[in-house]
């Protein structure tokens, strides 16, 4: 399927749910309290402008994880209201129709999403802390304090630096000058992701050389080489150094929540991605892990990220990529052009050779597609990857196509509505309503599918428009009648790069992830 950065984010949110160690039962929603501000599209901007630091939860009333968060968020808000100065927590029902513009503006891809608004909205960052009251309180107290803390002694370092987390320290001869200013700027930008400190003495730190030429940035981490240094204080270079150094050479995809931040970075990266999936509990795991780690070391100078995933924890990824458990052990490469390369039933001693073939351009991409249906006489036509271009772009017709997932509740609700609309338009030979299972078929690059259901309207001339109107049969029929072009049966073509996409996604969140 077409995989763009926002589509990856949708996958990441699904992975975050899969990695949650909390129980899945639905708790009762928290009683409405006064500590959390309730905002809507009319009051939002005024509230942001009023508060130098404000935290906002974007939620949906039907979202189970939002219900689970509600009492914790309320209790945290009560505790933080006593902080000096008070830390304000707010919430927005992003599922309410009038508030949809806020969800679009702030790129809300799933529920709940929490964002930190600093400097009266001039600086907006993702909340990446705990989801229970005490953890929320501790995390936000850190966020409202200085972006980097001074380390004056080894005892300070012991108190601030967690051996299981990444910690970034600037080592200076004095706390002034361009290097210090740039370091503090980067610390402010990345403070929701990492903890920062600054010191005059490298020997206060638990790892790394004590005798250093200052200034220097030292990054301490719980994986690979444990400590890396850089002397480049250019802001862009420092950001790049941190980005490259804060992901393991091989990311592990299992149920350990400590690995979740590395998974987020892995899937957010624009670099090609190699993913090895197998059963972690079986005997060959150790030999595969050793061989895969050696391959990652051998190709560390190539622009590619490596992940090893446990079958049990990777069901969301299997569903997303259309993989099957009986194909494991398997290795999948997703490159920057959305091409995929797959080797199923791979042996540990085949990994390096297969990766060399990839880098040498000798592998053939593969495409997920269900079989083309032999019978396709229902009102809503079934389209698969192997015939989508012929059906949508070369038919000379106006095609409304839905990209759906079989498990998606909103898709199930929409199905009879599309059937009704298709039946109403059945006598119009210039119009077709179709659907594609986006979990079993690769979506063409002409369509940006970020969630389910996603609908697009394609005209005979190749104009591609996202459908963001109402979800009744009458709404759909009216839209098609107003938007359709006169069919051109003798002018069939594939628009390719010249296809025009119009419209914006008014409903970025399509289902609870």
UniProtKB/Swiss-Prot annotation:
Biased amino acid composition, Basic and acidic residues: 502-513
SUPFAM superfamilies: Thioredoxin-like
Positions occupied by motif Prevents secretion from ER: 510-513
Residues carrying sugar: 279
Catalytic residues in the record: 63 (nucleophile), 66 (nucleophile), 408 (nucleophile), 411 (nucleophile)
Enzyme Commission identifier(s): 5.3.4.1
Annotated site (Lowers pKa of C-terminal Cys of first active site): 131
Keyword DNA damage tagged: no
GO process annotations (BP): protein folding; response to endoplasmic reticulum stress
Compartment(s): Endoplasmic reticulum lumen
Domain Thioredoxin residues, every copy: 24-145, 366-485
Entries under Pfam families matching the protein: Thioredoxin (PF00085), Thioredoxin_6 (PF13848)
GO molecular function annotation: protein disulfide isomerase activity
Feature type site, description Contributes to redox potential value: 64-65, 409-410
Chain positions covered by the region annotation Disordered: 485-513
Disulfides per UniProt: 63-66, 408-411
Site feature (Lowers pKa of C-terminal Cys of second active site) residues: 471
Keyword field: Disulfide bond, Endoplasmic reticulum, Glycoprotein, Isomerase, Redox-active center, Repeat, Signal
Catalytic activity annotation: Catalyzes the rearrangement of -S-S- bonds in proteins
Gene3D superfamilies registered for this protein in UniProt: Glutaredoxin (3.40.30.10)
GO CC, any one term: endoplasmic reticulum lumen
Residues making up the signal peptide according to the UniProt record: 1-23
Stated role: Participates in the folding of proteins containing disulfide bonds, may be involved in glycosylation, prolyl hydroxylation and triglyceride transfer.
Similarity field: Belongs to the protein disulfide isomerase family.
Descriptive protein name: Protein disulfide-isomerase
Gene behind this protein: PDI
